[in-house]
Every structure is written in C-alpha cells, then in structure tokens.
C-alpha cells in the first residue's frame, strides 16, 4: 500500500492496483472484463495505506475458475504503456476535480496537521499532480516486483467453499509466487498537541 510508496512518487501503489485490472499478457482489458463477467464474478484491486487488496465475489461453483483469473491478473500483468498513460492522466484529472471538494481539502489538511508533511501517511493514496508526473511505468513494475509478496499476503474466504477446496485452489500459489522479503517501514509517529 501507500506505506511502500517512494515519498516523491506517491500514487505508485494506487496505479499498480489500477494497472492490474488493465488486462493480462493474454487478455486485453476488454477481454479480461468479459472473462470476469462471463463467470458472473467481480474482481477488484484497491490500495489502502498498508495494503493492496484483491477483492473477489463469485459463485462457489465458479470459485476455481475465478481464482484462475485472479492468478492471471496477479502473475501476468499486461503493463501496457498506453493504458498506463491513460490511467495516470485520469488520476491527475480526478485530483484536480477533488480540489473543489471541501471534504477532500479538509481531509488533506487534517492529515498534514496530524502527521506532518514529511510523513507518507499525510499523503493521498492517489498521489498529487506533482508526484504522478514523476512516475514512470518502470516505477510500477519495480513496486510490483519488490512490494507484493506472499509473506505479507492474507487470504480470507466467506461463503460456501470448503477448506479442502480452498486449499486445492490456492496450492498453485506456492509455485507461482516468489517469496521475497518486504520491509514495511514503520511510519513516523503522528504529531500530538499538548
């Protein structure tokens, strides 16, 4: 999540999340969307302060097939330069629009007062116009390679899937996902008022 962003390139984790849903090596964005829809499933990737989350909703009878798509999204991202530029520009425009929101402005000011400007937690997950202008596609690939690791992953299942079925489906992760050490920095403490 945000905690692993370079302080000068805040928004990288968010762009990685968005890029993961922009197709795979074997599927264009439209083909991926259609494959998910054909299963009656929903897959989304979002960034929080301390995580990149892959959320999946599917019928239990489509669990294995849906997870195959999740694996494809996670292990075979497309990294299309045109999609990257489109998403980056979209995000910059969204940031510009958000400046007119009193709630958004208040939230940003509050975060800066609490954490201080040099603390990553005072930054918006989406980044800023300035930070996004510094981010290149290679920065996203670097974040992806060095920040997403099974050691820091957790899987939660709710629904009509047996433990044995879940273990069978997730077994492939052991061979596909390289376990790397990811050092999650401790954020600086928030400022306190006396």
Regions found by a protein language model. Give the residues of each.
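A common structural junction motif
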Residues: 72-81, 173-181
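An aromatic/glycine/proline-enriched structural segment found at the starts
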Residues: 117, 121, 125, 150, ...
């Amino acid at each position: 999540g945000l905690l692993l962003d370079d302080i000068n390139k805040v928004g990288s984790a968010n762009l990685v999340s968005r890029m993961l849903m922009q197709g795979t090596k074997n599927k264009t964005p439209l083909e991926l969307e259609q494959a998910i829809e054909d299963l009656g499933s929903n897959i989304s990737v979002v960034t929080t302060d301390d995580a990149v989350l892959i959320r999946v909703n599917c019928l239990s009878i489509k669990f294995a097939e849906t997870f195959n798509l999740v694996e494809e999204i996670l292990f075979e991202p497309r990294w299309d330069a045109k999609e990257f530029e489109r998403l980056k520009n979209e995000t910059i425009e969204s940031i510009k629009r958000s400046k007119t929101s009193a709630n958004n402005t208040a939230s940003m000011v509050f975060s800066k007062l609490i954490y201080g400007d040099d603390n990553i937690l005072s930054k918006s997950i989406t980044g800023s116009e300035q930070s996004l202008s510094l981010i290149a596609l290679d920065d996203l690939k670097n974040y992806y390679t060095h920040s997403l690791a099974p050691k820091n992953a957790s899987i939660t299942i709710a629904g009509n899937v047996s433990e044995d079925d879940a273990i069978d489906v997730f077994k492939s992760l052991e061979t596909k996902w390289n376990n790397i050490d990811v050092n999650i920095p401790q954020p600086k403490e928030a400022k306190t008022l006396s």
